[in-house]
Each structure stands twice: as C-alpha cells, then as structure tokens.
Amino acid sequence: MAKKSAENGIYSVSGDEKKGPLIVSGPDGAPAKGDGPAGLGAPGGRLAVPPRETWTRQMDFIMSCVGFAVGLGNVWRFPYLCYKNGGGVFLIPYVLIALVGGIPIFFLEISLGQFMKAGSINVWNICPLFKGLGYASMVIVFYCNTYYIMVLAWGFYYLVKSFTTTLPWATCGHTWNTPDCVEIFRHEDCANASLANLTCDQLADRRSPVIEFWENKVLRLSTGLEVPGALNWEVTLCLLACWVLVYFCVWKGVKSTGKIVYFTATFPYVVLVVLLVRGVLLPGALDGIIYYLKPDWSKLGSPQVWIDAGTQIFFSYAIGLGALTALGSYNRFNNNCYKDAIILALINSGTSFFAGFVVFSILGFMATEQGVHISKVAESGPGLAFIAYPRAVTLMPVAPLWAALFFFMLLLLGLDSQFVGVEGFITGLLDLLPASYYFRFQREISVALCCALCFVIDLSMVTDGGMYVFQLFDYYSASGTTLLWQAFWECVVVAWVYGADRFMDDIACMIGYRPCPWMKWCWSFFTPLVCMGIFIFNIVYYEPLVYNNTYVYPWWGEAMGWAFALSSMLCVPLHLLGCLLRAKGTMAERWQHLTQPIWGLHHLEYRAQDADVRGLTTLTPVSESSKVVVVESVM
C-alpha cells in the first residue's frame, strides 16, 4: 500500500485506499486540535484522512460547475443591467472586468481546490495563517443556501398554480384581490373599455391581478419587518419539498450529484431556446431586443456602470463562496483545470448574453401590448420572475403552457445552484471534522442536519413579513461588498504570501504546462486593484436598503444586515490576529511558521521530486491490513 522512493526516502501512497482512513501524524503523536483531515493537520497533529472521492467522469465536474455558476442571476439580473447601463455599451466594462477579475479568480479557485484536494476551509492549508478566508466563504455560502432556496419555493408554487385552464394571476375576483384590482392589460382594451371616468394612464396606476397575486397571495406582505405575521402554509410546504429534493441530490456526494446535473444544467437551455423562438415571433419583440442592445455611450463614464459590471461578474461566476474549490477538489490531480475554467467562464457569460434576447423579446411584446415604454415593464430580480413574466404570459395564447415552462426552467436553474452550494458547504464541514467523527453515514447525517437548520431559518421568510427578511439576506449577507472583499484577499494570499510563480509551478505540475502569464499578472496586480476599487465605490455609494422604493428599513434591521456582512468579512483579520497572538517566537518567526504550507498525502509523490521537501520527513506503514499510513511532519 505504500512504497518507498529510493532517491528521497519518502513513501507514496498506493493500493486500495477505500478500506479505511489514512492516519496523519506528527512527531509527538498527539491528537490534532481543530484542523481537519484534508491536509497533514496542524503541526504535530494526528488525523484520520478518509479517502477522497473523485468525479466518475470529468464531464460531471463541468456540468456541476455550469449548474452552480449559471443560475437565476444570468436570466433575471444581467439582461436588466445591460439595458439599464447603456445596452451594448455595458458589454465593454463587463468583458474587461471578466478578463481582469472574473476569469482569473474563477481559475484560481478551481485550481486551488484541485491542487489541495480540500474544501473551502482546508484548501487554505496552502497558507494556514489566512485560513479565515475559508471560514468566511463557509459563512457566505451558508447564508446563500439559506435564502436562495426561497426563490425555488416561490417558483415551485407558481409552477403548481400554472396547471390550470386559467392562470390565477390573470383575473380579479379571488379572495386575495382588492377593489382596486383591474384585469385590463392591453392598451387597445383600455381604449375601448368603459373606465368610469378614468383615463388609461390613471388605470395603469391601479392594481393588476399579477401584483396582487404576488403580494397578497404568495407573500401576504405585511407592513414591515417589525410585523412578521403568520406562516404561509402553502409556500412552507413548497419550501419543504425543495429542501427534500436538495437533500436527495446531495446526500450521496459527487457520485450522485454529478449525474443529476446532466439534466438540471442542460434542460434550462432547451427551455431558453423554446422561449426565444416563441418570443421573437411576438409583435414588438424586435423593439425589445433593440432596447436591450442599443448603445448609450454616455453611460461608459458613469462609475455605477462599472460597479454593476463588477458585481454581476462576481455574482454570476459564484466567486468567493468556496463551492468552486470544493468542486475542484474532486478532480483528478492531473485534470486540465485551466482549460475547464476558460470553457466554463465563456459558457457563463454567453448564457447571460443569450438570456437577454429571451427576456427582452418578451418584454418588448409586453410593452407593445400595453402601449407603454419598455422602461415601464423592464424589471430585475424577483420583479421579473414573479411580476413581469407572469404578466406577459397572460397576453399569450395557451398561457398556462408558457408559464409552466418558464417556472420549470426557473426551478432547475436554481436547483443545481442550490444543491451544489450545499455540497460546497458540506465538503468544507466534513474536511474540518477530526478523526473521531469519521463513520459510515457521516455525510448523510451532516447533510440532513444542514438542510434541517436552513429550513428552520427559512421559516422566517415564509411569514407575512418574510420578504423583508429575504431582502436583508440578499442585500447584505452575500452582497458584492462581501464577495469583493473575499476575492481581494484570495489574490493577495496566493500571489504575494504563497507566491504567484510558485503557484504557477504547482499548476504546471498538475496540467503539464504553465498557464498564460496573464493569470499571474492578474492575481498579483490587476485583480486586487479591480476588487478594491469596486469595493471602495460600493462603500462610498452605499445606499440603505429600501424595499419596493417605499419601505425604509428600521435602524435595527439595517444593523442586522451589516451584522450578516461583517460576520464573514471579519473572519480574515480575526483569524489572522488570533493565530499570530497564539504562536511563539518573534513576529517574523511566527509569520514564517504560520505561512508554511501544510501538504496533503497526494502531494507526497509530487513534493518528493523537489530537492527541498518542505514539512515531510517520513511516511511509515502502520498496519497493512487496515491500510493505515503515518506521515511525520516537522511543521
């Protein structure tokens, strides 16, 4: 099971590792405290290392990354930002920031996970002093897992309600409608109708059944955050169904997840193509597409355009969440992650651009039918998914079919992003657990506990005041500010503390050649500058959260939001400070010791080829029958 290298005196691991964990030990044999099994543990620690599973096929990894990174933001946020920020002009800052910031960090996270064979926390064994980055990403992805699934619950609810002959949001007269509800959608209907002395413009200010279904039936919206109200049991059951679905997608690990994403990641593209074909055949579709792409060069000098481009890149590429490192950790050590990262980035951005044609062809039709400017119907986020599009399908023949198709696509887009996010969190969590917690059903129980905890927190979002809670999570916990902060430190640590050239050599060891020098330059200079620049702009131009342009959050609600943001951002400095204070020696000695990488077992053969094998002295077989290995570390 272990063989000795004649040249270096170092053993490498081989044989059947599935029969038991691998034991990693320090020279004193003392049990490790706090660090997990992905690397060689804390200096002088003893840890059991469960064998790490890998993707059955490399395409499983590609599909999982596509499913995770290509999500709701590509469909409901990018097209609106493109229209809002000068149409085709928006593509200039978007592409530039993708080249300088998005793609380099996307590649960095995947390659780091593949090289270290660890989840979001233990991947920073490459520089243990900055392991706070791992804790920060775990906090962020936990918040995302908690609130993101609410969109799936709402989409699932709309999907169920679409299986009717008449869509419930198409007409008034329901128990949730008010006397102000008006069913007239088409401008020509408005001109020919008896309006009780109301003009068409005045009628447009009345309540549509689409808005009343969303606010009064689905959300049962209260007056504010301070009025939580009761649970909406229909939406609660949809939420429970979504969590059960997520659990069974994740509970067996990447072997099962890698199969499910073949459907969840590809079928939305089929639906997008069908919706595009339908959309371009509608009257007014061309006008909508022109509004989507029409360049407004004056916007290029606006700082907000660059801020929106940067935050959208980091959102849509799913940077800073730790899930990409978790997915990369299941790759074969020699997988060409460089090629994969480029392909995945192109798919992500291409999907965003393509989705814009789908969305704005339908919004153009909607504006034409209502006789209004497209700015009156163009919306982003939940407003597009649950107000604008449901309103548009009521104007189409066979409306329930198009509604069901759209919400099924929405459900799949969100589902794979959700369960891969949960997978990333679980991977980081299991890597943290010490040897004594390793048992057969460890993953199944951990996933169940995670899903149950998130479901309990989600109950606050299915109350009458739940939308206000959802907006708090969305605006603060995984905001552009937190992701930019995370990305900045990732680049600084890898490029300046560990060493950009050193990491390029590590990548060359995996894929057989050094990537383009552009990646090294970006990690070292361009990307940190871009991240910090947009981060500062976000702080300077910060505006307190307002819901629906009317409800201003109370001071304690805003304080709660900043607590969400700071709970991840402070992980880096607090962990760094704590490590330096606990260590012994001069400050220089502490820094040198705490920035020394902790290598994993899979690095043995690779590191043994170097003249300077840092941190490893011997690898001794302990028990041939139990397939246990002891590695001594001088770190």
Curated annotation (Swiss-Prot):
<comment type="similarity">
    <text>Belongs to the sodium:neurotransmitter symporter (SNF) (TC 2.A.22) family. SLC6A8 subfamily.</text>
</comment>
<feature type="transmembrane region" description="Helical">
    <location>
        <begin position="561"/>
        <end position="581"/>
    </location>
</feature>
<feature type="topological domain" description="Cytoplasmic">
    <location>
        <begin position="1"/>
        <end position="60"/>
    </location>
</feature>
<feature type="transmembrane region" description="Helical">
    <location>
        <begin position="445"/>
        <end position="465"/>
    </location>
</feature>
<feature type="transmembrane region" description="Helical">
    <location>
        <begin position="395"/>
        <end position="415"/>
    </location>
</feature>
<keyword id="KW-0739">Sodium transport</keyword>
<dbReference type="GO" id="GO:0016324">
    <property type="term" value="C:apical plasma membrane"/>
</dbReference>
<feature type="modified residue" description="Phosphoserine">
    <location>
        <position position="623"/>
    </location>
</feature>
<keyword id="KW-0597">Phosphoprotein</keyword>
<dbReference type="GO" id="GO:0006836">
    <property type="term" value="P:neurotransmitter transport"/>
</dbReference>
<feature type="topological domain" description="Cytoplasmic">
    <location>
        <begin position="501"/>
        <end position="520"/>
    </location>
</feature>
<feature type="transmembrane region" description="Helical">
    <location>
        <begin position="88"/>
        <end position="108"/>
    </location>
</feature>
<feature type="topological domain" description="Cytoplasmic">
    <location>
        <begin position="582"/>
        <end position="635"/>
    </location>
</feature>
<feature type="region of interest" description="Disordered">
    <location>
        <begin position="1"/>
        <end position="27"/>
    </location>
</feature>
<feature type="glycosylation site" description="N-linked (GlcNAc...) asparagine">
    <location>
        <position position="192"/>
    </location>
</feature>
<feature type="transmembrane region" description="Helical">
    <location>
        <begin position="480"/>
        <end position="500"/>
    </location>
</feature>
<protein>
    <recommendedName>
        <fullName>Sodium- and chloride-dependent creatine transporter 1</fullName>
    </recommendedName>
</protein>
<feature type="topological domain" description="Cytoplasmic">
    <location>
        <begin position="252"/>
        <end position="269"/>
    </location>
</feature>
<feature type="topological domain" description="Extracellular">
    <location>
        <begin position="82"/>
        <end position="87"/>
    </location>
</feature>
<feature type="topological domain" description="Cytoplasmic">
    <location>
        <begin position="416"/>
        <end position="444"/>
    </location>
</feature>
<feature type="glycosylation site" description="N-linked (GlcNAc...) asparagine">
    <location>
        <position position="548"/>
    </location>
</feature>
<keyword id="KW-0812">Transmembrane</keyword>
<feature type="topological domain" description="Extracellular">
    <location>
        <begin position="363"/>
        <end position="394"/>
    </location>
</feature>
<feature type="topological domain" description="Extracellular">
    <location>
        <begin position="291"/>
        <end position="304"/>
    </location>
</feature>
<keyword id="KW-1133">Transmembrane helix</keyword>
<feature type="topological domain" description="Extracellular">
    <location>
        <begin position="466"/>
        <end position="479"/>
    </location>
</feature>
<dbReference type="Pfam" id="PF00209">
    <property type="entry name" value="SNF"/>
</dbReference>
<feature type="topological domain" description="Extracellular">
    <location>
        <begin position="542"/>
        <end position="560"/>
    </location>
</feature>
<dbReference type="InterPro" id="IPR037272">
    <property type="entry name" value="SNS_sf"/>
</dbReference>
<dbReference type="GO" id="GO:0015881">
    <property type="term" value="P:creatine transmembrane transport"/>
</dbReference>
<feature type="topological domain" description="Cytoplasmic">
    <location>
        <begin position="326"/>
        <end position="341"/>
    </location>
</feature>
<keyword id="KW-0472">Membrane</keyword>
<feature type="transmembrane region" description="Helical">
    <location>
        <begin position="521"/>
        <end position="541"/>
    </location>
</feature>
<feature type="transmembrane region" description="Helical">
    <location>
        <begin position="305"/>
        <end position="325"/>
    </location>
</feature>
<feature type="transmembrane region" description="Helical">
    <location>
        <begin position="61"/>
        <end position="81"/>
    </location>
</feature>
<feature type="transmembrane region" description="Helical">
    <location>
        <begin position="139"/>
        <end position="159"/>
    </location>
</feature>
<feature type="modified residue" description="Phosphothreonine">
    <location>
        <position position="620"/>
    </location>
</feature>
<feature type="transmembrane region" description="Helical">
    <location>
        <begin position="270"/>
        <end position="290"/>
    </location>
</feature>
<feature type="modified residue" description="Phosphothreonine">
    <location>
        <position position="617"/>
    </location>
</feature>
<keyword id="KW-0325">Glycoprotein</keyword>
<dbReference type="GO" id="GO:0005309">
    <property type="term" value="F:creatine:sodium symporter activity"/>
</dbReference>
<feature type="transmembrane region" description="Helical">
    <location>
        <begin position="231"/>
        <end position="251"/>
    </location>
</feature>
